[in-house]
Amino acid sequence: MAISKEEVLEYIGSLSVLELAELVKMFEEKFGVSATPTVVAGAAVAGGAAAESEEKTEFNVILADSGAEKIKVIKVVREITGLGLKEAKDATEKTPHVLKEGVNKEEAETIKKKLEEVGAKVEVK
């Protein structure tokens, strides 16, 4: 039985950010492509300042290390991401791991503070 394009889109739409990031990695590995956008040299010169300001408005929160108190970190990861217990545990064990993508600076700093309070090491990029 063939799967329709609509069913694929429906399934992808139901994935969490974490699951979607893993799916993108799988596509990159299987097809030998990169999901990073390419920049045309002429456009980079003309819009370089605009691109820099856009990049600074959205941040990714990366769990670099879960530290010694993993249970507390798992609880905070679940609170932040809405993941289930197993998914949150997997996220804390497979570091570095992107927890949130495209968040504003204030939210990224709040998430970082919560995780660091329970002993995790966090990067905001």
From Swiss-Prot:
CDD domains referenced in this protein's UniProt entry, alphabetically: Ribosomal_L7_L12 (cd00387)
Cellular component terms, GO, for this chain's entry?
cytosolic large ribosomal subunit
Oligomeric state and interaction partners are given as: Homodimer. Part of the ribosomal stalk of the 50S ribosomal subunit. Forms a multimeric L10(L12)X complex, where L10 forms an elongated spine to which 2 to 4 L12 dimers bind in a sequential fashion. Binds GTP-bound translation factors.
Database matches in InterPro entries = Ribosomal_bL12 (IPR000206), Ribosomal_bL12_C (IPR013823), Ribosomal_bL12_C/ClpS-like (IPR014719), Ribosomal_bL12_oligo (IPR008932), Ribosomal_bL12_oligo_N_sf (IPR036235)
Q: Mind telling me which Gene3D superfamilies this protein's record contains?
A: 3.30.1390.10, Single helix bin
| Keyword vocabulary terms for this entry | Ribonucleoprotein, Ribosomal protein
Record the organism: Helicobacter pylori (strain G27)
Does the keyword section mention Ribonucleoprotein? yes
User: One of this protein's GO BP terms?
Assistant: translation
Q: What is the lineage of its organism?
A: Bacteria, Pseudomonadati, Campylobacterota, Epsilonproteobacteria, Campylobacterales
- Protein name from the UniProt record: Large ribosomal subunit protein bL12
Q: Report the family membership.
A: Belongs to the bacterial ribosomal protein bL12 family.
Would I find Transcription regulation among this entry's keywords? no
* Cross-referenced Pfam families: Ribosomal_L12, Ribosomal_L12_N
Extract the GO molecular function terms from the UniProt entry. mRNA binding; structural constituent of ribosome
The function of this protein is: Forms part of the ribosomal stalk which helps the ribosome interact with GTP-bound translation factors. Is thus essential for accurate translation.
